[in-house]
Amino acid sequence: MSEHGPLRIGIGGPVGAGKTTLTERLCAALRDDYSVAVITNDIYTSEDAEYLMRAQALPLERIRGVETGGCPHTAIREDASINLAAVADLRASFADLDVILIESGGDNLAATFSPELADLTIYVIDTAAGQDIPRKKGPGLARSDLLVINKTDLAPHVDVDLALLESDARTARGARPFVMAALKSGQGVAQIVAFLEREGGL
């Protein structure tokens, strides 16, 4: 843990893009070297938290499920108090925390995290959602610290040109990095971890 407390990583993206899969993969990749905890956001359930518990991503006491109600982006941006309270609770429970992963509820391309809540942000999109997603931009996609283009293995089945998808992502993001990934099989996870260690100072 740094003098500023644990690194808080916000993970956002539309429903079904692979946020929970990324969270699970990051837990598995980081937990042997760092003290890790997770906060998940769901609108009316704690389904994502329960999934991570069943998957044994982390010990149960290191996972917090937040039920946001209403619009999920409000709880990570306009009024992040419910998530900030969960961060404070985890820090009180685990004095040695290095990393807190904060997974947002599924939202649209405009969703972003309050800088008060997240030090670094990852935005996940789904190749199967269509060729034009990067061209639609939106703050979450264009301004997150890292974009993860997930489910690239499905591209041949959904008529998506990966080279064009990469080109459009580069145009939308400028110099900001992105990773082509297939998180279910683990492809791209090492690149994401390397980014977090480098940019997050782990």
Curated annotation (Swiss-Prot):
It is found in: Cytoplasm. InterPro entries: CobW/HypB/UreG_nucleotide-bd, P-loop_NTPase, UreG. GO terms for biological process: urea catabolic process. GO terms for cellular component: cytoplasm. It comes from the Bacteria. One of its GO terms (molecular function) is GTPase activity. GTP binds at G13, P14, V15, G16, A17, G18, K19, T20. Keywords: Chaperone, Cytoplasm, GTP-binding, Nickel insertion, Nucleotide-binding. PANTHER family: UREASE ACCESSORY PROTEIN G. Belongs to the SIMIBI class G3E GTPase family. UreG subfamily. HAMAP family: UreG (MF_01389). Homodimer. UreD, UreF and UreG form a complex that acts as a GTP-hydrolysis-dependent molecular chaperone, activating the urease apoprotein by helping to assemble the nickel containing metallocenter of UreC. The UreE protein probably delivers the nickel. Facilitates the functional incorporation of the urease nickel metallocenter. This process requires GTP hydrolysis, probably effectuated by UreG. This is Urease accessory protein UreG.
